[in-house]
Amino acid sequence: MEDLNEANFSHLLINLSNNKDIDMQYTSTLSVVHELLSAINFKIFNINKKSKKNSKSIEQQHPVVHHAASTGREFNRR
C-alpha cells in the first residue's frame, strides 16, 4: 500500500467532517479521528526531538572512532 501524504489525509478528514451532506455521527467520528491523529503526530514529534537531543549528547560524551582496517576484510594486493 502506498503511503498517504499526511497533509492531504488531514485535509481530507477536515473536508469530510465539514460536509453538510454527511450524517452528523459520521462527521463527528471523522473529527475525532483527525484529533487523535494530530495528538499522535505531536507525541511522535516530541519523541523524535528528545531522541535527537539524546543522541547528540551521547555522541559528544563518547565520540565514535572509525578505523579503516576494522572491516574484517583482507585485500588481495597483487
Swiss-Prot record:
Put simply, this protein is called Protein OPG157
A Pfam family that this protein carries is Chordopox_A30L
Q: Recite the UniProt keywords alphabetically.
A: Phosphoprotein
Family membership: Belongs to the orthopoxvirus OPG157 family.
Reported function: Required for the association between the dense viroplasm and the viral membranes to form the mature virion (MV).
> Would the keyword Phosphoprotein turn up in this protein's UniProt record?
yes
Species lineage:
Viruses, Varidnaviria, Bamfordvirae, Nucleocytoviricota, Pokkesviricetes
Q: Where is this region: Disordered?
A: 53-78
Q: Which organism is it from?
A: Monkeypox virus
Q: How does it get modified after it is made?
A: Phosphorylated by viral OPG054 kinase.
Q: How does it assemble?
A: Interacts with protein OPG092; the interaction stabilizes both proteins. Interacts with protein OPG062.
Q: What gene is this protein a product of?
A: OPG157
What does UniProt give as the signal peptide span? none
